[in-house]
């Protein structure tokens, strides 16, 4: 049986040439595939170097694996260093490793950001959980959870010129430079704006409640005095052009009487039941800075910017006595020690003491805080709080004088200061248009200071009281000492000596 042969034989010359061409094409294809494999191998090795892997050791002792690339004649440089040199190989390896390490580090940082942030968050959460056993963290958590002892800060857009607590309710009045009065209900958790009363066309310089809290009195740069009914929120009485000059201060004597003082040194006494002033006296030439009286309300005292303390007899409606002039502004005052002592603060930071009824010249002088004093309020019968341009509220013991420490702080000069009816809460406003509250109930536990007691004036002036937002450095070391003492007590035990 005849079988057809499909394979070509090399007997024919043309057929042999065709076979040789096919073999050449096959060999070329195999060489190209090997080159591609070697290129992929080199790329993988470069990626490993970029990721920080060490450079493979290509010393002459290493065995040939059949995948090493052959240098091209086109890249040959007769002036280049011998590639077989160990030194050049080490240098190349070091450069490649450092460059690859830096690049790979950056690449890992960029690529791992999302997952890295999650891992960091988880680590932080775990750290917080573990840190709850630490003394410092526990103290911080306790401070955060500790209930507030004073109302939060009140912030206004307008400059606050004066503040005043209501005698019976948890309400504070804030007078502003545009002539409005804001009434806030305060609480340790939050403050609530009750209403805003538009009372004056110019800056409201002083605001006071009557003793029974029924009426709100205000005086202004517009020379008027306004009386507002707290229940109806309506105007009760208007004393239009009460003074010929801008009114600077106002003082309530009782439920009916009040006094005012202006920028030109005029003092007037008013009765809410009448339309006109009871009397007026012009014994001074400069601004009346403050007016006050004692519980008997027989004498009305006035301090002025021209350095005089002037006393008026209310019943006789005339001046009682005027002090010797001082070369500084007398800015504020308070009555202490059972109405037996009058203390006056000055623009030079001094505190002058007068025996009651003897107002011609001071009987004692205390250098004070070495910073202008513009405000003073009695906290107890022997403790005063003073404030001024340095932004600090300081407590002072009266007769004998002692700096008790810093009650509170503002970032800017303090403009007004007041204490509530039970003497436990102080409010202060500053040039930053803010009102801050300070719980000073701890003053009830302060004992009386004797004249012969030793004290450190430098430390006292910088000491921070419990209401202050700053702590004392000594408190930190005191806590450390206490912890060390507790550790020593815990480590101590019965003796094992025979």
Curated annotation (Swiss-Prot):
Instruction: Provide the alphabetized UniProt keywords.
Output: Repeat, WD repeat
In residue numbers, the region (Disordered) covers: 1-133
Top-level taxon: Eukaryota
Give the Polar residues compositional bias ranges: 114-123
> In residue terms, where are the WD repeats?
155-194, 199-238, 242-280, 283-322, 325-364, 409-448
State a single Pfam family of this protein: WDR55
Amino acid composition bias (Acidic residues), ranges on this chain? 12-23, 31-48, 83-95
Q: Does the keyword Repeat apply?
A: yes
GO biological process terms, semicolon-separated: defense response to Gram-negative bacterium
Q: Which PROSITE patterns match?
A: WD_REPEATS_1, WD_REPEATS_2, WD_REPEATS_REGION
Q: Which family does it belong to?
A: Belongs to the WD repeat WDR55 family.
Name listed for the protein in its UniProt record: WD repeat-containing protein 55 homolog
């Amino acid at each position: 049986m005849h079988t057809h042969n499909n394979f070509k034989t090399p007997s024919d010359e043309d057929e042999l040439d065709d076979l040789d061409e096919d073999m050449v094409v096959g060999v070329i294809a195999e060489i190209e595939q090997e080159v591609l494999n070697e290129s992929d191998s080199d790329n993988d090795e470069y990626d490993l170097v970029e990721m920080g892997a060490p450079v493979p050791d290509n010393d002459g002792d290493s065995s040939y694996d059949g995948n090493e690339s052959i240098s091209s004649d086109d890249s040959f440089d007769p002036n280049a260093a011998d590639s077989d040199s160990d030194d050049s190989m080490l240098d190349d390896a070091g450069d490649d490793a450092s460059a690859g390490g830096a690049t790979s580090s950056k690449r890992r940082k960029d690529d791992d950001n999302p997952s890295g942030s999650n891992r960091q968050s988880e680590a932080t959460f775990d750290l917080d959980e573990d840190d709850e056993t630490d003394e410092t963290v526990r103290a911080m958590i306790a401070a955060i959870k500790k209930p507030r002892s004073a109302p939060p800060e009140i912030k206004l857009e307008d400059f606050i010129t004066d503040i005043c607590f209501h005698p019976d309710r948890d309400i504070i009045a804030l007078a502003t430079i545009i002539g409005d009065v804001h009434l806030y209900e305060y609480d340790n958790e939050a403050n609530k704006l009750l209403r805003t009363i538009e009372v004056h066309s110019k800056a409201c310089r002083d605001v006071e409640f009557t003793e029974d809290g029924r009426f709100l009195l205000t005086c202004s740069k517009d020379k008027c005095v306004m009386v507002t009914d707290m229940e109806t929120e309506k105007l009760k009485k208007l004393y239009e052009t009460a003074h010929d000059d801008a009114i600077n201060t106002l003082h309530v004597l009782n439920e009916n009487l009040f006094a005012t003082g202006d920028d030109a040194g005029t003092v007037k006494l008013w009765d809410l039941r009448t339309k006109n002033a009871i009397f007026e006296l012009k014994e001074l030439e400069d601004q009346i800075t403050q007016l006050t009286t004692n519980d008997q309300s027989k004498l009305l005292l006035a301090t002025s910017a021209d350095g005089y303390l002037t006393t008026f007899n209310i019943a006789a409606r005339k001046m009682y006595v005027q002090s010797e002039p001082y070369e500084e502004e007398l800015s504020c005052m308070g009555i202490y020690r059972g109405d037996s002592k009058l203390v006056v603060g000055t623009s030079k930071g001094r505190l002058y003491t007068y025996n009651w009824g003897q107002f011609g010249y001071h009987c004692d002088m205390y250098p004070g805080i070495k910073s202008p004093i513009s405000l003073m309020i009695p906290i107890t019968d022997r403790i005063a709080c003073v404030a001024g341009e340095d932004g600090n509220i300081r407590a002072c013991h009266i007769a004998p004088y002692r700096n008790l420490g810093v009650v509170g702080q503002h970032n800017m000069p303090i403009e007004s200061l007041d204490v509530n009816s039970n003497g436990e809460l102080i409010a202060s406003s500053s040039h930053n248009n803010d009102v801050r509250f300070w719980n000073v109930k701890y003053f009830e536990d302060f004992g009386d200071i004797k004249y012969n007691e030793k004290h450190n004036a430098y430390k006292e002036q910088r000491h921070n009281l419990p209401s202050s937002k700053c702590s004392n450095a000594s408190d930190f070391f005191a806590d450390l000492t206490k912890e060390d003492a507790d550790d020593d007590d815990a480590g101590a035990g019965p003796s094992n000596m025979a």
